[in-house]
Amino acid sequence: MSIFTPTNQIRLTNVAVVRMKRGGKRFEIACYKNKVVGWRSGVEKDLDEVLQTHSVFVNVSKGQVAKKEDLISAFGTDDQTEICKQILTKGEVQVSDKERHTQLEQMFRDIATIVADKCVNPETKRPYTVILIERAMKDIHYSVKPNKSTKQQALEVIKQLKEKMKIERAHMRLRFLLPVNEGKKLKEKLKPLMKVVESEDYSQQLEIVCLIDPGCFREIDELIKKETKGKGSLEVLSLKDVEEGDEKFE
């Protein structure tokens, strides 16, 4: 599709229009096809790679640019880049049924890939294949949400799959190096956040190697920094504690 915009004499091609209604008026932005989903999923972070122009339109196909007073009334600002971000994040993508179906299929696969990459069977510590995660998602009738990032949806899928199968996020392996004086007291605070303590060594420092749920990493990191006043250290030994091989389920 080629759109001619007489206001600035730019011919926009390969256009995906994202629309938002605000304050009783319609606002549109012109994006590159296949880039909107990437922005919303967090894969694409460069706004210039997504937007064909930083202008806000009332009608992209006719090249009608929104009036400054209408932007201020609807969005509280006339900063078109910021308004473009709002529309890009929350607006409705104008695509054909075929394009929408293709996008949703791709997001479905992306979500399954994230889940397969981050999770294991807790009994065998082995990962599931992407194909089997896709099958499980279909079994629970998971419906992709086009306006939500694939990472957020992957977390939702994991929660729902836990009710139907043996699955959990793979543990991270960490090493703590803590001053001996603060270490013993800090260890008690860290205990509830550690899944498995693999080794402890008391010498000049307290060294602990353990497995944790990835969701606890930030809390542990902040706790160590706060309690040791920067004297302690935290090292990630492995992001995923898994066994080799693929776990299959029917």
Swiss-Prot record:
Record keyword Nucleus present: yes
Positions where N-acetylserine occurs in the chain: S2
UniProt keyword Nucleus, yes or no: yes
Primary location recorded for the protein, binned into one broad class: cytoplasm
Superkingdom as given in the UniProt entry: Eukaryota
GO biological process: bone marrow development; bone mineralization; cytosolic ribosome assembly; hematopoietic progenitor cell differentiation; inner cell mass cell proliferation; leukocyte chemotaxis; mitotic spindle organization; rRNA processing
InterPro entries on file: Ribosome_mat_SBDS_CS, Ribosome_mat_SBDS_N_sf, Sdo1/SBDS, Sdo1/SBDS-like, SDO1/SBDS_C, SDO1/SBDS_central, Sdo1/SBDS_central_sf, SDO1/SBDS_N
GO cellular component, one term: nucleus
PROSITE patterns the UniProt entry points to: UPF0023
GO molecular function terms attached to this record: microtubule binding; ribosome binding; rRNA binding
Compartments, as annotated in UniProt: Cytoplasm; Nucleus, Nucleolus; Nucleus, Nucleoplasm; Cytoplasm, Cytoskeleton, Spindle
UniProtKB keywords: Acetylation, Cytoplasm, Cytoskeleton, Nucleus, Phosphoprotein, Ribosome biogenesis
NCBIfam families to which the protein is assigned, alphabetical: RNA_SBDS
Family designation: Belongs to the SDO1/SBDS family.
Record text on subunit structure and interactions: Associates with the 60S ribosomal subunit. Interacts with NPM1, RPA1 and PRKDC. May interact with NIP7. Found in a complex consisting of 60S ribosomal subunit, SBDS and EFL1. Interacts with CLN3.
Function: Required for the assembly of mature ribosomes and ribosome biogenesis. Together with EFL1, triggers the GTP-dependent release of EIF6 from 60S pre-ribosomes in the cytoplasm, thereby activating ribosomes for translation competence by allowing 80S ribosome assembly and facilitating EIF6 recycling to the nucleus, where it is required for 60S rRNA processing and nuclear export. Required for normal levels of protein synthesis. May play a role in cellular stress resistance. May play a role in cellular response to DNA damage. May play a role in cell proliferation.
Name of this protein: Ribosome maturation protein SBDS
Protein's gene: Sbds
